[in-house]
Regions:
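Surface-exposed extracellular loop regions of Gram-negative outer-membrane beta-barrel proteins
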Residues: 226-278, 367-433, 497-500, 505-509, ...
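Outer-envelope beta-barrel architecture signal
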Residues: 77-79, 120-122, 157, 174-178, ...
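Boundary at the C-terminal end of the N-terminal hydrophobic targeting segment
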Residues: 11, 15-18
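Bacterial N-terminal signal peptides
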Residues: 1-11
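Exposed, low-structure sequence patches enriched in small/polar residues
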Residues: 341, 425-736
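Outer-membrane beta-barrel transmembrane domain signature of Gram-negative proteins
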Residues: 205-226, 365-404, 543-588, 593, ...
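Catalytic-domain carbohydrate-binding cleft regions of carbohydrate-active enzymes
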Residues: 161, 179, 256-257, 285-473, ...
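Structural preference for beta-rich elements and adjacent junctions enriched in aromatics
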Residues: 18-371
Length: 736
């Protein structure tokens, strides 16, 4: 399905009366004696201003049926948050028992803190069982030591969060002004509440772009010793045994022989309260290989998620403001999954005032690449501009997605503006590339991607114009399709009927584009219509047609025809009608099914296109089993029909993916997971095979961690490998 995603621009919920918005201001309550219980009427909670009148952002209505109240106080060392959640008549869900596992499956309450006004945003949440979760805008590896307790009484529950100031990156001042918000999730209804509210806020947590709508909190006192996080060092020791003990995942996604790294180091040294030096020496990634396998045929290159600590920390500093994407991940000059195993990396990153930046160097077998990212973003996130640059130097046989000998330098400038009052917004992106590949010059290797938008509570309009040169292909970047030029448009409508209607919310979306190559032929054209309806009984229905035509060259073997003079061009379809049905999505026990069908081009063994009719289906579910176990199951199928030499007969091919996982909690800081995946048949996108993997994780009170992994879920078939890894951590917690 085609889609368009936009950075720095909000979604479009139904209008409702505002409660607390960004114009509100509050003063921090400083106490000498820390609170000891949940009673909001007791000292010192009673000194703080009560926080109430939450908004149900899912239904865009005041949260009066399940009210939430809270208070916040500070002392010299910590932020204390007490929250009372009334939930009479609705089941309180507390199925999880291990910290940072299963976020969103249980009820939770939490706080969001923007400590600098420039991207240093944090969320801290806890469930009725006292299970903790936390997120940082800077890194997915944010996992410091902090505390939370909870208590259930009848149909209500209470929580207290204790957050050390030392784990937060704050301003370099003794008295500071932050922005903050309180949030709540009711799992059995799949509904979210927020205290700070604007009609353009998004209905999910964590959402770091919504910080622009939060009120301010003045008078936050931060002692000088808490201004700067402590230096952090992580030293790991690792042993790998088994027949495949030296097989590890590469930039291509496949596995190859590579020497095991038995010892490695990651370090983070704060230079100021918001700027740090990050270093990695002989890093190991065996415990972050994840299952991203699919059997669905693809029209374009598929983007992968990055989980390696060195790249994931501070990743947002290298992303252009106003970045947007059509039909896949955005065109980027730096796409870290294209970098394979590396030997060392250094990085300087952080923020000051309205500026943020990152400077990175990574080197490994046959490559040495440097990346610069700079952003200027106003505190309300309404305006920003950014500059990115990548200098890549690759030798033959290097461990990246481009193993050839190539030198490449790429620049990208972008700017974005959005007016919350009028709803108008603009985004401009321009990049140029110069490299050792023939004709890789700014005249032919460039991209210009621009957008104008109008966002209102019940509708949105996006108009795009994209011009990507035929030689644009940054070797450390991600490019869906080059040699395109033309307009596109997306129009969406939404409604939240309320009242006695059986519909909770609904949306209708239309998208189309027509993009030419330099010969004047249509290189790509798309149209889709999509309807999305969520009912109050938790049934979710999504359906619509999608049509796409793509011109290929050299008899269908090349995506870009410039070098070959656009000879032997052929236009092929990638069409599908689809329908998906979900029940209890967003709750601990979801059921989901989808079906799609249509003429969708595939390729034979020689890489030539063949006319194919593709049918696909998917079924999945997950659920808690008792108080310790969580299970999930999925089955996907692909059936391809294509002509044979006999005009009246078709040949068939297919593929089936089955996936099952079981997790067991051993306490707040340890868990075991088992995974089984099988792919059979060759009529699909995946490679056949059976994969069995298992992992055990234990976190200790000294913040050290133990990992024991058998195999890996990232492989097509079972990797006969057992990895035992211990991480010894000094200083502050992971990701701080």
């Amino acid at each position: 399905m085609l889609f368009l995603s936009v950075g720095l621009l909000a979604a479009f919920p139904h209008a409702a009366a505002a409660t607390t918005d960004r114009n509100a201001s509050f003063t921090a309550t400083i106490v000498e004696v820390p609170p000891a219980g949940f009673d909001l009427a007791s000292q010192p909670w009673s000194q703080a201003q009560p926080i109430a009148d939450f908004e149900n952002i899912t239904t865009q209505s005041p949260a009066t049926k399940n009210p939430t109240t809270a208070r916040i106080v500070f002392d010299r060392n910590n932020v204390y948050v007490a929250i009372h959640a009334a939930q009479t008549g609705i089941p309180i869900v507390r199925t999880q028992s291990t910290n940072n596992v299963g976020f969103g499956l249980d009820d939770y309450v939490g706080i969001g803190l923007d400590t600098t006004g420039n991207g240093q945003t944090y969320y801290f949440e806890t469930t009725p069982g006292g299970v903790r979760y936390q997120q940082s805008a800077e890194t997915v590896k944010f996992s410091p030591l902090w505390n939370a307790t909870a208590n259930v009484t009848g149909g209500d529950w209470d929580a207290m969060l204790v957050i050390p100031l030392a784990i937060l990156r704050t301003q370099n001042a003794p008295i500071q002004t932050w922005r903050f918000n309180l949030v709540r999730h009711i799992a059995s209804l799949n509904e979210n509440q927020t205290w700070a509210y604007d009609r353009l806020m998004n209905d999910y947590v964590p959402n770091f772009s919504d910080v622009r709508y939060w009120p301010s909190l003045a008078g936050v006192k931060v002692a000088s010793r808490a201004n700067r996080p402590k230096p952090r060092a992580e030293i790991f020791g690792l042993e790998s045994i088994g027949l495949d003990r030296d097989r590890y995942q590469q930039a291509t996604g496949g596995f190859a022989r590579q020497g095991t790294r038995h010892v490695g180091l990651d370090a983070n040294v704060p230079i100021t309260s918001t700027i740090s030096f990050v270093g990695a020496l002989a890093p190991d990634f065996s415990n972050v290989e994840i299952d991203q396998q699919t059997i669905s045929p693809q029209e374009f290159r598929r983007g992968l998620s990055e989980y390696r600590p060195f790249f994931s920390q501070g990743a947002d500093f290298f992303i252009p403001v106003g970045n947007f994407a059509v039909n896949g991940p955005p065109n980027s000059i730096f796409y870290s999954p294209s970098i394979g195993p590396f030997d060392r990396g250094t990085k300087l990153e952080g923020s000051f005032g309205a500026q943020s930046f990152g400077l990175l160097n990574v080197a490994g077998a046959g490559f040495n690449d440097s990346v610069l990212g700079y952003q200027h973003v106003t505190s309300d996130r309404g305006f920003g501009y950014s500059l990115q640059a990548v200098s890549a130097h690759h030798a033959d046989g290097n461990l990246t997605a481009f193993p050839a000998a190539i030198d490449d330098v790429t620049y990208n400038f972008s700017a974005s503006n959005s007016n919350r009052t009028t709803g108008f917004g603009e985004a401009l992106n321009y990049g140029s590339e110069r490299g050792s590949v023939t004709n890789t010059t700014p005249r032919l290797a460039y991209k210009s991607e621009n957008l104008v938008s109008l966002i209102k509570p019940n509708y949105q309009i996006f108009l795009t114009y994209r011009d990507v040169g035929p030689k644009w292909n940054p070797i450390d970047g991600f490019t869906s399709l080059a040699d395109i030029r033309g307009p596109g448009a997306l129009v969406g409508f939404s409604t939240i009927p309320g009242g006695a209607s059986v519909i909770k919310k609904a949306g209708l979306f239309f998208f189309g584009d027509r993009l030419l190559d330099r010969s004047g032929a249509t290189h790509q054209s798309d149209f889709f219509m999509n309807a999305d309806v969520t009912f109050k009984n938790l049934i979710h229905l999504n359906f619509g047609p999608s049509t796409s035509a793509l011109r290929l060259y050299d008899g269908g073997t090349s995506l870009v025809g410039y070098d070959g003079g656009y000879r032997n061009g052929v236009t092929v379809p990638f069409n599908s009608d689809s329908v998906s049905l979900g029940y209890k999505d967003g709750t601990p026990t979801p059921y989901d099914a989808s079906l799609s069908w249509g003429p969708f081009e595939t390729f034979d063994g020689n890489g030539s296109p063949r006319s194919t009719y593709v049918r696909q289906y998917s079924l999945s579910t997950s659920r808690p089993v008792g108080s310790k176990f969580t299970a999930s199951a999925e089955i996907d199928g692909t059936l391809e029909a294509f002509p044979t030499t006999m005009m009246t007969r078709s040949a068939y091919d297919g593929q089936t993916l089955r996936r099952f996982s079981l997790g067991e909690a051993f306490g707040n800081e340890s868990n075991l997971s088992l995974s089984l995946r099988s792919i059979n048949g060759r009529g699909g996108f995946g490679s056949p095979g059976i994969n069995v993997s298992a992992s055990y994780h234990q976190r200790f009170t000294n913040a050290g961690e133990l990992f024991i992994n058998y195999g890996t879920p990232a492989a097509n078939s079972t990797i006969q490998r057992v990895v035992v890894k211990y991480v010894l951590r000094f200083g502050s917690g992971s990701g701080t």
